[in-house]
Amino acid sequence: MFYHSTRNADAAVDSSRAVLEGLAPDGGLYMPEYIPGFDWQACLSGSSQDMATMILSALLPDIPDMRALVARAYTGKFQTEELTPTVTVGGFTVLELFRGPTSAFKDVALSMLPQLLTTAKAVNGMEKDIMILTATSGDTGKAALEGFHDVDGVRICVFYPHGGVSQVQRAQMVTQEGGNVTVCAVRGNFDDAQTGVKQIFAACQGKDLPFMLSSANSINIGRLAPQVMYYFRAYRDLLDAGKISLGDEVNFSVPTGNFGDILAGYLAKKLGLPVGKLICASNANNVLTDFICTGTYDKRRPLLKTTSPSMDILVSSNLERLLYLLSGDTQLVASLMKQLNTEGVYTVPAELLAAIRAEFWGSYCDDKRAEETMGRVYKNLGYLCDPHTAAGWAAAEDYIVETDDHRPMVVLSTASPYKFPVAVLTAIGGDTSGSEFDQMKRLSAMTGVPIPKNLSGLQGKEDRHTGVIDKDAMLEYVLSL
């Protein structure tokens, strides 16, 4: 299957090459020429690993031995065989995506990406090492480091915004072991780090480097495709619980930053899964809510630091893929992305906005409401959730109030509450004194919810990666590795 850039349909590569390169040469994102035919009902009959194998084989057919790759990625690494279990909380179904090795939803994709990338490297006869460049707003960095550490033929460099991640998230990254890993803080915010990574790709295009650059961010289709599985898993769980009949549509509320997680839901729908409305939940950085409401994407606003840092983003890269999927017009997408880069704003045509709003609905949740939601859900329903999940919960409530759409609702829970203990303790009336590690212990004592072992084991570990650089120094830093 051929993939081409969202900005130019002429230069096509096969799916293995798209995974290997990560970003298209013109700065666009790789997308398949067509969405393949898919037996979605057969996909629902298997295990989570069976589902992943079927979906990835359909979307990335040029990568062989997919079943073995899936088994290597997931077996024994998650808390349950389902990988992403669901739990009924009040009137919603919560899809718990934090049961992997780093307690964040990105484990699903970043356990799989190293298998896809190293196989794609072999398929393409590449002898050079691959250098993975990743910008993180918190969770991607650790999940990528966990997936790629000590993988032969691959090096990884993670950039994170200095002071822009939680103490626990920072500790997860800077204590990372492995002979092929580098972690560095960037003075600036996540958008600065992400833009810096894209500029490194552009600056190195066509140059003879001792390594090939690739990405572990969701700009890489190999990062995005594995996330489709858990939408099928959630639907299957609803079937098994008797909450729906086969063919019934289900709504999904998705905490959204870079637009990758929610786009995976749309890809699931394109593969045939009966997905109803996809609810895009933002925090106070509500550029996506404004866009879905008005059709104007305007990043010309201050980036606010919130209690949900993985959504502290003003440039949602994967939205470009949606614009392409719904318009099919690479020239339009290229023009819009140029406007965003030069002017900081663009407006989509009315018919494209109508197509977006037919599939997506947007709402946002500031820190105050996230705190209220976490406290209320715990007090009334006994469920402990993090600030990102609270945004998804609040958006789901908003959607039902505004639309009176009472189809079954799945709220994606994207991170363990123990990654954000001060916010969660504040919400449920706990003492927030001491370090985040003290807070985790106090939170567990209050609620009886165990601390994930990967987080409780961080305290006292040695900081191995303490560098801090200016955003303009990122290229020089990478070339020096």
Predicted regions and their residues:
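PLP-dependent amino-acid enzyme catalytic core
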Residues: M1-L481
